[in-house]
Amino acid sequence: MKKVILVSIIAATSLMAASDKQIEDFYSQMVDSSVKVKVADRHKVAGDIEAVVVKLSKDGNSQDEIVFTKGDFIFPDVIDLKEQKSYLAEVKKEVIAKGISKIYKDEDKANIIVLGSDPKKPTIIMFSDPECPYCRAELAKIETTLKDSNVEIVLTPVHDISSLQKSSLIYKDAKAAKSDSDKVKILRKYYAEDYNVDDKSVSKDDVAKIDNLRKKYFAAGVRSVPFIVNKSDLK
Protein backbone atom coordinates (compact mmCIF):
# COMPACT_ATOMS: atom_id res chain seq x y z
CA MET A 1 0.00 0.00 0.00
CA LYS A 2 1.34 3.42 -0.90
CA LYS A 3 2.23 5.76 1.93
CA VAL A 4 0.50 9.04 1.14
CA ILE A 5 0.33 12.25 3.17
CA LEU A 6 -2.83 14.31 2.73
CA VAL A 7 -2.56 17.94 3.86
CA SER A 8 -6.13 19.04 4.63
CA ILE A 9 -7.54 22.55 4.37
CA ILE A 10 -11.20 21.68 4.89
CA ALA A 11 -12.86 18.52 6.07
CA ALA A 12 -16.07 16.53 5.89
CA THR A 13 -16.84 12.98 4.94
CA SER A 14 -18.46 11.29 1.98
CA LEU A 15 -18.03 8.24 -0.23
CA MET A 16 -18.01 10.38 -3.37
CA ALA A 17 -15.58 13.12 -4.41
CA ALA A 18 -16.53 16.76 -3.91
CA SER A 19 -18.59 17.94 -6.86
CA ASP A 20 -17.54 20.71 -9.24
CA LYS A 21 -20.17 22.96 -7.66
CA GLN A 22 -18.90 22.32 -4.13
CA ILE A 23 -15.36 23.22 -5.17
CA GLU A 24 -16.48 26.27 -7.14
CA ASP A 25 -18.57 27.46 -4.19
CA PHE A 26 -15.61 26.98 -1.87
CA TYR A 27 -13.36 29.17 -4.02
CA SER A 28 -16.10 31.73 -4.67
CA GLN A 29 -16.22 32.42 -0.92
CA MET A 30 -12.52 33.35 -0.94
CA VAL A 31 -12.31 35.62 -3.99
CA ASP A 32 -13.93 38.85 -5.12
CA SER A 33 -17.43 38.45 -6.55
CA SER A 34 -16.18 39.73 -9.91
CA VAL A 35 -13.87 36.72 -10.28
CA LYS A 36 -15.33 33.84 -12.29
CA VAL A 37 -14.60 30.43 -10.78
CA LYS A 38 -14.79 27.32 -12.97
CA VAL A 39 -13.54 23.74 -12.63
CA ALA A 40 -11.53 23.30 -15.82
CA ASP A 41 -10.37 19.72 -15.40
CA ARG A 42 -10.28 16.82 -12.97
CA HIS A 43 -8.71 13.38 -13.06
CA LYS A 44 -7.62 10.63 -10.67
CA VAL A 45 -4.00 10.67 -9.54
CA ALA A 46 -3.77 8.11 -6.71
CA GLY A 47 -6.46 5.60 -5.86
CA ASP A 48 -9.69 7.53 -5.35
CA ILE A 49 -7.93 10.89 -5.01
CA GLU A 50 -8.67 13.33 -7.82
CA ALA A 51 -6.69 16.37 -8.96
CA VAL A 52 -8.94 19.33 -9.76
CA VAL A 53 -7.84 22.33 -11.83
CA VAL A 54 -9.82 25.45 -10.92
CA LYS A 55 -9.65 28.41 -13.31
CA LEU A 56 -10.05 31.88 -11.79
CA SER A 57 -10.86 34.55 -14.41
CA LYS A 58 -11.32 38.31 -14.39
CA ASP A 59 -11.10 41.01 -17.08
CA GLY A 60 -9.59 38.67 -19.64
CA ASN A 61 -6.90 37.39 -17.26
CA SER A 62 -6.91 33.97 -15.64
CA GLN A 63 -4.89 31.69 -13.42
CA ASP A 64 -5.16 28.03 -12.51
CA GLU A 65 -5.37 26.71 -8.97
CA ILE A 66 -4.91 23.02 -8.22
CA VAL A 67 -6.49 21.09 -5.36
CA PHE A 68 -7.07 17.43 -4.61
CA THR A 69 -10.27 15.81 -3.44
CA LYS A 70 -11.43 12.58 -1.87
CA GLY A 71 -14.91 12.42 -0.47
CA ASP A 72 -15.79 15.91 0.69
CA PHE A 73 -12.20 16.58 1.70
CA ILE A 74 -10.02 18.84 -0.41
CA PHE A 75 -6.26 19.06 -0.01
CA PRO A 76 -3.63 21.51 -1.31
CA ASP A 77 -1.20 18.66 -2.04
CA VAL A 78 -0.78 14.91 -1.93
CA ILE A 79 2.71 13.59 -1.21
CA ASP A 80 3.65 10.02 -2.05
CA LEU A 81 6.34 9.00 0.45
CA LYS A 82 7.29 5.82 -1.38
CA GLU A 83 7.85 7.59 -4.69
CA GLN A 84 9.09 10.76 -2.97
CA LYS A 85 6.96 13.00 -5.14
CA SER A 86 4.46 15.80 -4.79
CA TYR A 87 1.36 15.35 -6.91
CA LEU A 88 0.87 19.12 -6.84
CA ALA A 89 4.21 19.67 -8.57
CA GLU A 90 3.40 16.91 -11.05
CA VAL A 91 -0.05 18.24 -11.94
CA LYS A 92 1.24 21.82 -12.15
CA LYS A 93 3.77 20.68 -14.71
CA GLU A 94 1.04 18.90 -16.68
CA VAL A 95 -1.14 22.03 -16.68
CA ILE A 96 1.75 24.26 -17.75
CA ALA A 97 2.80 21.80 -20.47
CA LYS A 98 -0.73 21.88 -21.83
CA GLY A 99 -0.68 25.68 -21.92
CA ILE A 100 2.77 25.82 -23.50
CA SER A 101 1.93 23.26 -26.19
CA LYS A 102 -0.72 25.54 -27.66
CA ILE A 103 1.83 28.23 -28.51
CA TYR A 104 5.19 26.42 -28.71
CA LYS A 105 4.23 24.46 -31.81
CA ASP A 106 3.78 27.77 -33.67
CA GLU A 107 6.80 29.52 -32.14
CA ASP A 108 9.13 31.42 -34.46
CA LYS A 109 12.26 29.29 -34.90
CA ALA A 110 14.32 32.43 -34.32
CA ASN A 111 13.13 32.34 -30.69
CA ILE A 112 14.34 28.78 -30.09
CA ILE A 113 18.03 28.05 -29.56
CA VAL A 114 18.48 24.43 -30.57
CA LEU A 115 21.31 22.37 -29.10
CA GLY A 116 21.65 18.80 -30.30
CA SER A 117 19.76 17.00 -33.05
CA ASP A 118 20.09 13.32 -32.23
CA PRO A 119 16.80 11.61 -33.19
CA LYS A 120 17.59 8.81 -30.74
CA LYS A 121 17.60 11.20 -27.78
CA PRO A 122 14.62 12.86 -26.09
CA THR A 123 14.33 16.64 -26.30
CA ILE A 124 13.84 18.96 -23.36
CA ILE A 125 12.61 22.55 -23.59
CA MET A 126 14.30 24.95 -21.20
CA PHE A 127 12.87 28.39 -20.40
CA SER A 128 15.76 30.49 -19.18
CA ASP A 129 17.06 33.92 -18.13
CA PRO A 130 20.67 35.15 -18.55
CA GLU A 131 20.60 36.81 -15.10
CA CYS A 132 19.11 33.87 -13.19
CA PRO A 133 21.71 32.08 -11.01
CA TYR A 134 19.93 28.74 -11.34
CA CYS A 135 19.84 29.18 -15.12
CA ARG A 136 23.58 29.81 -15.04
CA ALA A 137 23.97 26.55 -13.15
CA GLU A 138 21.99 24.72 -15.86
CA LEU A 139 24.17 26.29 -18.54
CA ALA A 140 27.33 25.30 -16.66
CA LYS A 141 26.40 21.63 -17.05
CA ILE A 142 24.89 21.86 -20.53
CA GLU A 143 27.51 19.54 -22.08
CA THR A 144 26.51 16.84 -19.60
CA THR A 145 22.82 17.42 -20.32
CA LEU A 146 23.46 17.09 -24.05
CA LYS A 147 24.90 13.61 -23.57
CA ASP A 148 21.38 12.38 -22.77
CA SER A 149 19.05 14.95 -24.35
CA ASN A 150 18.65 17.48 -27.10
CA VAL A 151 17.89 20.92 -25.67
CA GLU A 152 15.70 23.72 -27.00
CA ILE A 153 16.10 27.03 -25.14
CA VAL A 154 13.57 29.86 -25.06
CA LEU A 155 14.60 33.03 -23.27
CA THR A 156 11.88 34.23 -20.90
CA PRO A 157 13.73 36.52 -18.48
CA VAL A 158 12.10 37.33 -15.17
CA HIS A 159 14.55 40.09 -14.28
CA ASP A 160 14.74 43.75 -15.30
CA ILE A 161 15.57 45.42 -18.60
CA SER A 162 19.21 44.29 -18.69
CA SER A 163 18.08 40.65 -18.85
CA LEU A 164 15.80 41.55 -21.76
CA GLN A 165 18.69 43.28 -23.52
CA LYS A 166 21.00 40.30 -22.99
CA SER A 167 18.33 37.94 -24.32
CA SER A 168 17.97 40.05 -27.46
CA LEU A 169 21.74 40.01 -28.02
CA ILE A 170 21.86 36.24 -27.52
CA TYR A 171 19.23 35.68 -30.19
CA LYS A 172 20.98 38.11 -32.53
CA ASP A 173 24.38 36.43 -32.18
CA ALA A 174 22.96 32.90 -32.22
CA LYS A 175 21.67 33.44 -35.76
CA ALA A 176 25.27 33.44 -37.01
CA ALA A 177 26.38 30.44 -34.93
CA LYS A 178 27.59 27.53 -37.03
CA SER A 179 27.67 24.86 -34.32
CA ASP A 180 26.31 23.93 -30.92
CA SER A 181 29.62 24.89 -29.33
CA ASP A 182 29.33 28.35 -30.90
CA LYS A 183 25.84 28.73 -29.43
CA VAL A 184 27.04 27.64 -25.99
CA LYS A 185 29.89 30.18 -26.14
CA ILE A 186 27.38 32.91 -26.98
CA LEU A 187 25.11 31.88 -24.12
CA ARG A 188 28.01 31.83 -21.66
CA LYS A 189 29.21 35.24 -22.82
CA TYR A 190 25.92 36.92 -21.96
CA TYR A 191 25.13 34.73 -18.93
CA ALA A 192 28.42 35.71 -17.27
CA GLU A 193 27.83 37.54 -13.99
CA ASP A 194 30.35 40.24 -14.92
CA TYR A 195 28.84 40.97 -18.35
CA ASN A 196 27.40 44.48 -18.57
CA VAL A 197 25.11 45.55 -21.39
CA ASP A 198 25.70 48.70 -23.36
CA ASP A 199 22.24 50.29 -23.43
CA LYS A 200 22.91 51.62 -26.93
CA SER A 201 23.48 48.10 -28.28
CA VAL A 202 19.82 47.10 -28.05
CA SER A 203 16.88 49.10 -29.39
CA LYS A 204 13.64 49.64 -27.51
CA ASP A 205 11.85 47.65 -30.22
CA ASP A 206 14.14 44.66 -29.67
CA VAL A 207 13.58 44.86 -25.92
CA ALA A 208 9.82 44.97 -26.54
CA LYS A 209 10.04 41.80 -28.66
CA ILE A 210 11.63 39.88 -25.78
CA ASP A 211 9.12 41.36 -23.36
CA ASN A 212 6.25 40.13 -25.56
CA LEU A 213 7.88 36.71 -25.89
CA ARG A 214 8.21 36.23 -22.15
CA LYS A 215 4.71 37.55 -21.43
CA LYS A 216 3.30 35.01 -23.86
CA TYR A 217 4.85 32.12 -21.92
CA PHE A 218 4.10 33.67 -18.53
CA ALA A 219 0.44 33.72 -19.59
CA ALA A 220 0.77 30.04 -20.56
CA GLY A 221 1.89 29.16 -17.04
CA VAL A 222 5.67 29.60 -16.89
CA ARG A 223 6.12 31.34 -13.55
CA SER A 224 9.81 30.87 -12.84
CA VAL A 225 13.09 29.94 -14.51
CA PRO A 226 14.70 27.67 -15.28
CA PHE A 227 11.56 25.81 -16.23
CA ILE A 228 12.23 22.53 -17.99
CA VAL A 229 9.67 20.35 -19.72
CA ASN A 230 9.94 17.27 -21.91
CA LYS A 231 8.99 18.12 -25.47
CA SER A 232 7.14 14.80 -25.65
CA ASP A 233 4.81 16.07 -22.90
CA LEU A 234 3.55 18.89 -25.10
CA LYS A 235 0.38 17.38 -26.52
Specify the residue positions occupied by each region the protein language model found:
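Non-globular targeting/processing and membrane-anchoring segments
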Residues: 18-123, 186-235
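Hydrophobic h-region of N-terminal signal peptides that target proteins for export
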Residues: 8-17
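Structural alpha/beta surface segment adjacent to cysteine/selenocysteine redox centers
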Residues: 120-122, 126-202, 218-223
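Intrinsically disordered, low-complexity boundary segments flanking structured domains
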Residues: 9, 24-28, 139-141
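Positively charged n-region of N-terminal signal peptides that target proteins for export
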Residues: 1-4
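Short, well-ordered coil/turn elements that cap or connect secondary structure elements
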Residues: 12, 32, 146-148
